[in-house]
């Protein structure tokens, strides 16, 4: 049974892990971060948010540390941000989705409002799955570089 859905996946039953060259593409992150610096004045003119909570989910092999720049930016625009709090995102494994559901429930209860979910790459798959399973707790989903099918 698939971890995320009752539907049969169109993917093959077994997919090998990504190759080392493909995994090494993630090393481009510091250069991409540097590319944001010239855009910073424009980003600072973005409208302010309403203070609602946003949970940010990292991509594969990343953790909350890698989402700090994004979360700090969102905080500067008046959002209350949370990391996913589960260490490195090592892909679908037992307990991850259940922990994310509990975090979403707790964040929504604490704020009294729906929560926005931002997912980066694989984190976007978790965000979409949470929205599918708990739509009454989710305000919106934003995905960044997330695969879809």
Q: Where are the model-predicted features located?
A:
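Serine-dependent carboxylesterase/thioesterase catalytic core
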Residues: 52-65, 69, 75-149
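Flexible, membrane-associating and regulatory peripheral segments of lipid-active enzymes
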Residues: 1-54, 67, 72, 77, ...
């Amino acid at each position: 049974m698939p971890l995320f859905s009752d539907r049969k996946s169109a993917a093959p039953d077994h997919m090998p892990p990504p190759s080392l060259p493909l995994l090494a593409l993630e090393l481009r992150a510091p250069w991409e971060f540097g590319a944001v610096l010239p855009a910073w004045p424009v980003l600072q003119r973005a409208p302010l948010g309403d203070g609602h909570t946003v949970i940010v989910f990292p991509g594969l092999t990343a953790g909350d540390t890698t989402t700090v720049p994004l979360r700090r930016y969102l905080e500067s625009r008046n959002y209350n941000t949370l990391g996913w709090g589960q260490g490195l995102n090592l892909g679908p494994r037992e307990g991850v989705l259940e922990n994310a559901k509990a975090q979403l429930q707790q964040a929504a209860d604490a704020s009294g409002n729906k929560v926005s979910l931002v997912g980066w790459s694989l984190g976007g798959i978790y965000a979409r799955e949470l929205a599918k399973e708990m739509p009454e707790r989710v305000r919106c989903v934003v995905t960044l570089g997330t695969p879809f099918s």
